[in-house]
């Protein structure tokens, strides 16, 4: 039982308990009064006592499966309000910590929040794990699902089932999660609840009678969700009496306390001062702080089996925080097996990154390193370009991941950065049996090395698209033009079609989603997953200016696209070059063979303007001398290309 708090003590953070629980506990204080009256120590002690009294059978860990913009963050806010974690009307999108998450309406980093709920009879401890929905962040999604017993399958009543919903459903289903269908945005005039229920039944084989129709915006029927979670989602399978095993779900870098890790305690307890051991790096750490997210970091003296909580391990190098790693208590780890699911993230998209101003490299290098600390899935190594100077070769999980990283760099550090055209990891198989993965187009075998190669392999993805019936022809044409191969077509209800195509990853990263949105007037949705490597006729194309290859503009393409792409490149690059005193040739070359060419005519000075009209021999002599001089300049002259030309070309400023 809580002691009546002394007046005058001010609690500086967080809501304590829901009004429902306060009433059930016969306390007369509201949440706001508790904030004022309970000191920080009393608050923490009361919080720990309440957690300790809740049996693991009353824990529920769940996530929300949804397509982008189907209302996941808004629904999370309503659930937090309902359980007293935040005040009604407080800031929206509580779980979206990054600016880019709020602005784009996407979740990039996995987050969690703890909630207390009392049904009038007993207490429950709920952990809502907010996961990214986009395939680029699928590693974080699968790790988050591993800490959950179930999920809310959120579907927009006006849009129905979308591609991301389908992909994340199958991921959650494959991991054994219990799914509760939620139909959101029923307050819209365009809402079609019956159609959404039919789609849920036909696409996911879920009982439409289990659907809960809500409006996260207005709060209509949201109160039905948590009782359904308690009834349908199982409690975590764990044992507080066993030795400690904790799964690392996510991590981030805090400038004041260092690395903060989000962990799922599978067995045992963890407390401040405990020495823990990493299963994969074999390094030990002294735990500086443990606690729950309520909704922000709220320290407690312990966290126990079943909880999804945070720890501050005193880790000096954030690169040691391997998502999916298992942590044990030092000295009690013998014969313990690591938890399944650890896998190093594999970048699928690579870009060259260079500061817009070369003088800023050193300052930007520090900023780049700091940002990478928060995202272990980004690979980073320095590289040098003849055209753009010092820079970095960055590896990302996908094109959205690359775009988000660039935006975070600009918003959080004010840095201006140039990204080269995205490329994918190609596999080269040599005649001697050696295999090599190439991530930089400049390293792709050229004409001299071509004869040592047995075959070239390029990665493919299985793209899942949902489109309205009237645009199916446009989408099929788009996929065909991008070397796609149809695998499946399924007609959903309410005029929607589900298409599955296998498409080269290189085509996907070249704004395929933008083109898909364009040919469907914005109504299509897309998700994808890796589909392995295939043998392919791919070639290295170099853009040469007066015979000099421009390494920053080298690309790898399919031979069938060589002529069209070469023509596009030389025509566009010509716009950004200034006139010279001699003729300049811009060529696209494949294995030293020119596939496209543009010419910039030489500046011409009128050397005959002072001659008399009748002096024909002198006139011809001067023209001949000028012609010979330009020929010599072309042979020995060097074209100076301003950095702005590369920037404009790579940014596609047409």
Swiss-Prot record:
Broad class of the protein's primary localization: mitochondrion
HAMAP family: LepA
Classification via Pfam families: EFG_C, GTP_EFTU, GTP_EFTU_D2, LepA_C
Family statement: Belongs to the TRAFAC class translation factor GTPase superfamily. Classic translation factor GTPase family. LepA subfamily.
Principal EC category: hydrolase
Function, as annotated: Promotes mitochondrial protein synthesis. May act as a fidelity factor of the translation reaction, by catalyzing a one-codon backward translocation of tRNAs on improperly translocated ribosomes. Binds to mitochondrial ribosomes in a GTP-dependent manner.
Reactions the enzyme catalyzes: GTP + H2O = GDP + phosphate + H(+)
Species this protein is from: Candida dubliniensis (strain CD36 / ATCC MYA-646 / CBS 7987 / NCPF 3949 / NRRL Y-17841)
Subcellular location: Mitochondrion inner membrane
Gene: GUF1
Source species taxonomy: Eukaryota, Fungi, Dikarya, Ascomycota, Saccharomycotina
MF terms (GO), sorted A to Z: GTP binding; GTPase activity; mitochondrial ribosome binding
The protein, known as: Translation factor GUF1, mitochondrial
GO CC list: mitochondrial inner membrane; mitochondrial matrix
Sequence positions that bind GTP: 66-73, 130-134, 184-187
């Amino acid at each position: 039982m809580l002691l009546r708090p002394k007046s005058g003590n001010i609690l500086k953070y967080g809501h304590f308990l829901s009004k429902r629980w306060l009433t059930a506990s016969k306390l007369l204080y509201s949440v706001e009064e508790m904030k004022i009256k309970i000191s920080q120590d009393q608050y923490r002690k009361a919080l720990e006592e309440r957690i300790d009294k809740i049996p693991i059978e009353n824990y529920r860990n769940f996530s929300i499966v949804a397509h982008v913009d189907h209302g996941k963050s808004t629904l999370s806010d309503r659930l937090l309000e309902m359980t007293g974690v935040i005040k009604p009307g407080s800031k929206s999108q509580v779980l979206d910590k990054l600016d880019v998450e709020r602005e784009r309406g996407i979740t990039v980093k996995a987050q969690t929040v703890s909630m207390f709920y009392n049904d009038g009879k007993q207490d429950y401890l709920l952990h809502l794990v907010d996961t990214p929905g986009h395939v680029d962040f699928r590693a974080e999604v699968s790790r988050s699902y591993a800490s959950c017993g179930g999920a809310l399958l959120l579907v927009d009543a006006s849009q129905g089932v979308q591609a991301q919903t389908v992909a994340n459903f199958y991921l959650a289903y494959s991991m054994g999660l219990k799914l509760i269908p939620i139909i959101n945005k029923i307050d819209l005039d365009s809402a079609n609840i019956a159609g959404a229920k039919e789609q849920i039944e036909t696409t996911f084989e879920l009982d439409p009678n289990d659907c809960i129709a809500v409006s996260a915006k207005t709060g209509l029927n949201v109160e039905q969700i948590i009782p359904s979670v308690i009834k349908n989602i199982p409690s975590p399978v764990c044992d507080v009496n066993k030795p400690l095993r904790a799964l690392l779900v996510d991590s981030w870098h805090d400038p004041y306390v260092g690395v903060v890790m989000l962990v799922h305690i599978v067995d045992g307890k963890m407390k401040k001062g405990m020495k823990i051991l990493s299963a994969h790096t074999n390094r030990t750490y002294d735990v500086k702080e443990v606690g729950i997210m309520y909704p922000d970091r709220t320290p407690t003296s312990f966290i126990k089996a079943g909880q999804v909580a945070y720890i501050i391990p005193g880790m000096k190098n954030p690169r040691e925080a391997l998502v999916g790693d298992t942590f044990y208590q030092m000295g009690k780890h013998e014969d313990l097996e690591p938890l399944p699911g650890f896998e190093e993230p594999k970048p699928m998209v690579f870009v060259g990154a260079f500061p817009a101003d070369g003088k800023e490299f050193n300052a930007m290098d520090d900023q780049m390193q700091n940002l990478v600390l928060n995202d272990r899935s980004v690979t980073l190594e320095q590289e040098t370009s003849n055209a753009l100077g010092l820079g970095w070769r960055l590896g990302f999980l996908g094109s959205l991941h690359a775009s988000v990283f660039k935006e975070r760099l600009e918003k959080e550090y004010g840095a201006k950065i140039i990204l080269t055209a995205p490329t994918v990891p190609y596999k080269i198989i040599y005649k001697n049996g050696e295999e090599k993965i190439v991530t930089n187009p400049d390293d792709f075998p050229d004409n001299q090395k071509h004869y040592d190669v047995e075959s070239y392999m390029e990665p493919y993805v299985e793209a899942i698209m949902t489109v309205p019936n009237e645009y199916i022809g446009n989408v099929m044409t788009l996929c065909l033009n991008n070397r796609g191969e149809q695998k499946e077509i399924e007609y959903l209800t309410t005029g929607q079609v589900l298409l599955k195509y296998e498409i080269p990853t290189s085509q996907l990263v070249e704004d395929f989603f933008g083109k898909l949105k364009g040919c469907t007037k914005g109504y299509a949705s897309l998700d994808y997953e890796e589909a392995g490597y295939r043998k392919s006729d791919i070639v290295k194309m170099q853009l040469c200016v007066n015979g000099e290859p421009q390494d920053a503009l080298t690309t790898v393409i399919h031979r069938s696209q060589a002529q069209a792409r070469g023509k596009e490149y030389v025509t566009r690059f010509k716009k950004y070059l200034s006139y010279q005193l001699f003729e300049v040739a811009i060529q696209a070359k494949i294995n030293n063979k020119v596939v496209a060419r543009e010419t910039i005519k030489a500046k011409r000075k009128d050397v005959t303007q002072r001659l008399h009209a009748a002096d024909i021999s002198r006139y011809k002599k001067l023209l001949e001398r000028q012609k010979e001089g330009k020929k010599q300049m072309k042979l020995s002259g060097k074209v100076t290309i301003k950095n702005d030309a590369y920037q404009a070309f790579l940014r596609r400023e047409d």
